[in-house]
Amino acid sequence: MSKQPSISYKDAGVDIDAGEALVERIKGVAKRTARPEVMGGLGGFGALCEIPAGYKQPVLVSGTDGVGTKLRLALNLNKHDSIGQDLVAMCVNDLVVCGAEPLFFLDYYATGKLNVDVAATVVTGIGAGCELAGCSLVGGETAEMPGMYEGEDYDLAGFCVGVVEKSEIIDGSKVATGDALIALPSSGPHSNGYSLIRKIIEVSGADIEQVQLDGKALADLLMAPTRIYVKPLLKLIKDTGAVKAMAHITGGGLLDNIPRVLPQGAQAVIDVASWNRPAVFDWLQEKGNVDEHEMHRVLNCGVGMVICVAQDQVEAALASLRASGESPWVIGQIAEAAEGAAQVQLNNLKTH
């Protein structure tokens, strides 16, 4: 008989009991997000979901995303309550731009050592995001992987599926010269540009928990959860039928995201003076001495979503969005692009 001690999975760094405790903690979160189309609860091998009634030619739309290095900031600040909403927002906002209603969401949480309290806090945030988006949290994967991540550090990924009527897909093909561009405000940098943001914090030596901007701690401004635009945009589509294109302003800012929904030969002319840039972006620009063009190439600079409608639909669109509690404004219009011109023209750029 070998005298070698018996080695358990726990000895190897994986605590099955902790994983099971987490599942129990988050069952209520998932239940709060349930849609009638979802069949069964958490814990099965696969999640089942019917297509909602009323669709004639339903088209499924899928997306996956993470929250980038905003997660590193969350870990450094030990602030985990809103990063889950960020994760949902990054996925569902990408779906709604083609007119899709998000149906269900799954998450992947990987860590070196599972901290049940932290993981439950993150998943509670995911559930809150799903409620804001009107989709069901139907499952996920929690992977405890010692040796792959340092201590209780974790990484997140989200996966979402939505549905849209085939004849009502919004793809930008109807965008025409003279159309108006309407913007919706962001809550801050959302979930993009955080490698630049963290570098600026490092170089400036700023204590972001002590720095105050507009009466708020810089840390809170940087960790403000990504806004979820799903319900106001679905209402806008239903109210007006006027939406020709939408762009979720993520990594790449206005310069890289608007062209993704423009047809050949169209140019978006944006008036940067049409909104007051939130103080957090001015602080980042000043402390990092960031070029103005680079600001708009990396960060959203206060714009979370851009919507294209015909000029004669502007007032109806603004009214619908305001009725949903949004603060929209006209940010620019569509022009015919000169040969070789960029698809986005930024006018009235700041000089500093």
Curated annotation (Swiss-Prot):
Top-rank EC class of the record's enzyme: ligase
Protein family: Belongs to the AIR synthase family.
Keyword flag Mitochondrion: no
InterPro entries: PurM-like_C_dom, PurM-like_C_sf, PurM-like_N, PurM-like_N_sf, PurM_cligase
Subcellular location: Cytoplasm
Reaction(s) catalysed (UniProt annotation): 2-formamido-N(1)-(5-O-phospho-beta-D-ribosyl)acetamidine + ATP = 5-amino-1-(5-phospho-beta-D-ribosyl)imidazole + ADP + phosphate + H(+)
GO cellular component: cytosol
SUPFAM superfamilies (alphabetical): PurM C-terminal domain-like (SSF56042), PurM N-terminal domain-like (SSF55326)
Domain of life: Bacteria
Annotated pathway: Purine metabolism; IMP biosynthesis via de novo pathway; 5-amino-1-(5-phospho-D-ribosyl)imidazole from N(2)-formyl-N(1)-(5-phospho-D-ribosyl)glycinamide: step 2/2
Protein name: Phosphoribosylformylglycinamidine cyclo-ligase
Native organism: Ectopseudomonas mendocina (strain ymp) (Pseudomonas mendocina)
Any GO MF annotation of the entry: phosphoribosylamine-glycine ligase activity
